Amino acid sequence: MLKQIILVSLTLQTLYANKFLGKVIDSKTGMPIIEANIQVNGSEQIGTITNKSGFFSLSVTNLDNINIKVTAIGYTTAEKNFEKQNFDMVTIKLNQSAVELSPIDVLAERSRLSGTGHNYYRVPGSLSLISKAEVLEFNDTDINRVISQVPGVYMQEEDGYGLRPNIGMRGSGLERCAKINMMEDGVLIAPAPYSSPAAYYSPTARRMESFEIRKGSSQIKYGPHSTGGAINYVSASIPQHLDFQGTISIGEYGTRIAKFKTGMSSSNYGLMFQTHLDNAGGFKKIDGGGDSGYDKKDFLLKARINTDSDFAALELKVSHTEELSHETYLGLTMADFEESPYRRYSASKKDQMDADHDQITVTGVVKVSSNLDITSTYYNNDFHRNWYKLNKVNGHSIGSILDQDEGTADSYELLSAENTENDAYDIKANNRIYNSKGLQTVLNSDFSIIGSKHNLMFGFRQHSDEMDRFQWSDLYKMNNGELVITTPGTKGEGGKNNRLYTAQANSVFIEDEIKINQVLMTVGTRYESISLERKDWGDDLNRDSTASSIKSADLNVLVPGFGVSYQLMDGIQIFTGVHNGFSPPGPGIDDEDDILPEESLNFELGSRFNSGFHSTELVVFYNDYKNLLGEDTEATGSGTYAQFNGGKVLIQGLELSYTNLISFSGLLFPFSFSYTFTDAKFKNSFDSDFGPWGNVSIDDELPYIPKTMIHARLGIEKGKIKSYLRFKHVDKTRTVAGQNTLTKLNSTDASNIIDLVAQYQLNTNLSFNFKVYNLTDSRVIVSSRPAGYRPNMPRQFVTSLTFDF
């Protein structure tokens, strides 16, 4: 199959145009410059940007010579002229510049994690960028597919679509991204990152322009979590000129996707509107029929005004997301999975997530002087979700039934029964309302003193968030294969169903980037003052009186970090860093709870090598946990939301990434490779009620952290035709802490997934592509939680038409 695909791709290469290919690098360090703009003078429609390796390519049909302008923030603009015989594999060097950033540039900079010029090669620590060019290659909807190329980042698949991802970094917990800082445009985007960090909302990946991931000491100024790292979703930017672009996709399993963006800018304002409509029928088949897909709608508006002089700018961002997904926590028994992995029991027919998310941010920039600017952002996020899903059958939890615990055999039979007695099924309305809001301000100053250059940042954030938990359960019976309600529940009634979790957090950070000759140092610290509270009204459903149970906790923590890089020679850099890791606990679900925060000491050592068209980065990391923190969410255990201290843990590993661009016989072969090795073990013994840990012994391996992950991508390009093949391997992964041999009963399957995309550029404005996800139709167990065994997505064909006018 693979040989046939390559032969077809090579045959198609006969249709091509002239190609102008190059790389943009820093003239002083030899390192690639990311997202540099390449524009053909005299033609606004012919242009591109460099990817994370500094590569770019342009189709320049019928041109004997070309004059281009290359721009990048923090660099002097360069204009170059090239003759046709020199179109192939050129290197363009840009000089670093102390050019003053405009307020509009500052707006863009403060929404990013990658600093001036989006150039992570300047950062003395681990920072990965998935650039605009790379995002457009596959144009994925599933965030798991997007970030799988980044070493040191772990994903636990759940629904096959990435609707509610589980992401961790360098051995941190994966559960609902609760141990990382999930951000959009530099603003915390998890529904309640302090009071209830498990994120049941994730921004839609396909509407994003690029993605940034920070790990190690390079992410110290982002809180509250610093043990893992930060992921920043970078939303669509306001275009410089009048523009209308979009993509329409159709595919198997009822997939229909439409994305449109339009906008423009003038000297004093900019405006952009984007919509993303995503609908899928689902790939799982419910016994007796039913919908297993989803319908998701996204709308984004950005408006900017700025002064004539380079003094001030103000940007408004408003977004709205709606989701209705027929997703469940109910998996399969091993026997049923082996017989039909994409089956769903009829008892999950009513399962449905109904969610709405609204965000508003207002960001203002003032240039106080040529080397001092102040940026302030007010943000407000509202999120409501009600995940109505099967909780128990005949009094047994769905987890115990699918684990086939003693006494649950009759309940298992009811999962696919045609008729039952009344009240056989407990379907719970997991109804929550979240709010997070705050004001964050950053002062940035550039100056020189005693032979050293400084970029000093001082920031503070006043933040509050809450999660209002007001749940209930309805009881059903099965009547001729259809669920019929028999006993409606009372809203808020039941243990721990009538609660409010709140958090107030004030944080301050200071960070100085110091450059002395070939040495770049970053020294910083972050201070967090956090107040957490949990109120439980119990049976007082109207909350007319003081809560019957109130639990509070206060935390004050200082999180320092230090990183340094040294430019050994042109294109070769080494770096190291150390920082304190921290993750706050909640107030506890019971009055007697006394949960300690997560604390660790984290080290990294790495090197970067860049020469010609290939780049390599190698990093080793060592995270020494004084105390690990776990939480029993419904996604990982029984859903008590109790937190557990896991004591000492040692997580160490290696991250390797490599990119190259090969030109041969008029064909281009872009290639990238990443590898992650992780060793994660408990360093003390203890007993816990947290299912994934259980009774732990020294040197037990942590669950859901694969030892080895590999990602590779190979492209073939010539003129109007591009095709890319990507491969992802994930080792068998332990599902419960332990040291015993991995089997189907205590681990996921090893996963080897291949995706293919082929694109044809019809003309300057139109392109067509054809994608195959999971080319070999590999069928594996990706998880045994929340309840039962769960499959990956089967092979799927998708076609798309993209336009840009």
Where are these regions (language model features)?
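Short acidic/polar hinge/loop motifs at secondary-structure boundaries
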Residues: 57-59, 187-215
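Short strand-turn segments of transmembrane beta-barrel domains in outer membranes
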Residues: 217-220, 229-264, 275
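Signature of Gram-negative outer-membrane beta-barrel scaffolds
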Residues: 453-569
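Gram-negative outer-membrane beta-barrel transporters
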Residues: 449-450, 515, 622-624, 642-737, ...
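Short, acidic, small-residue-rich periplasmic hinge/interaction motif at the N-terminus
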Residues: 25, 37-41, 71-75, 85-136
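Membrane-embedded beta-barrel scaffold of Gram-negative outer-membrane proteins
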Residues: 367, 373-391, 567, 573-577, ...
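Transmembrane beta-barrel wall of Gram-negative outer-membrane proteins
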Residues: 250-279, 288-328, 352-369
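Extracytoplasmic beta-strand/coil segments of soluble accessory domains associated
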Residues: 144-187
